[in-house]
A protein has these predicted regions:
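Residue-level signature of the cytosolic catalytic core of signaling kinases
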Residues: 43-46, 71, 123, 156
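Catalytic cysteine-centered active-site loop
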Residues: 60-112
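Aromatic- and glycine-rich peptidoglycan recognition patches
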Residues: 88, 95, 102-107, 122, ...
Length: 167
């Protein structure tokens, strides 16, 4: 909790993104969106391990620079944590760093467990956001809070960059 307190006092070192320093409470925390992953997708052992870890944190708030359950997560911190605790060893990557680890995959070839990448979600060069593709145009990502979301929404379509497959 002390690390979270520091993030709140410093606004995650991004006051342009976090204009207030208040702890969330039940009345201000957004509720996550849930999704039932098709059972056939979970027959893939790597994807099942990824989802076993990833779903533990649904509802956690977005924290700029966060990379563990004790600090909560930002998008790349969340994906890095999930991968490092489900069979990969990628260290702490940025969204661009995660993209660089992947082989690009076409929309026709994307499958559950691939990563999905976006540009222009905030002012930074290169890939700026990432999530885990879970099938049926749905991703699990660290929005605010960690939640499932539909990739067919206008926002995600406007910022979509690529799907990527981990080695």
């Amino acid at each position: 909790l002390s690390a979270y307190s520091l993030y709140m006092r410093t606004l995650g070192n991004r006051p342009d993104l976090f204009g207030q320093a208040q702890y969330p409470n039940a009345s201000t925390i957004k509720q996550p969106t849930y999704y039932d992953i098709p059972p056939e997708a979970l027959k893939d052992d790597r994807f099942a391990a990824m989802m076993e870890e990833a779903t533990k944190y649904i509802g956690y708030p977005y924290v700029w620079g966060g990379s563990s359950p004790s600090t909560s997560f930002d998008c790349s911190g969340y994906i890095s944590w999930v991968l490092n605790h489900s069979g990969w060893n990628v260290g702490r990557q940025t969204a661009q760093g995660l993209y660089n680890l992947c082989t690009p995959v076409s929309t026709a070839q994307v499958k559950p467990g691939d990563l999905v990448f976006f540009k222009g979600t905030y002012d930074t060069p290169g890939v700026s956001h990432c999530g885990i593709y879970v099938g049926n145009s749905i991703m699990l990502h660290c929005g605010d809070p960690i939640s499932y979301t539909n990739l067919n929404s206008k926002y995600w379509q406007e910022h979509f960059y690529s799907y990527g497959r981990l080695p």
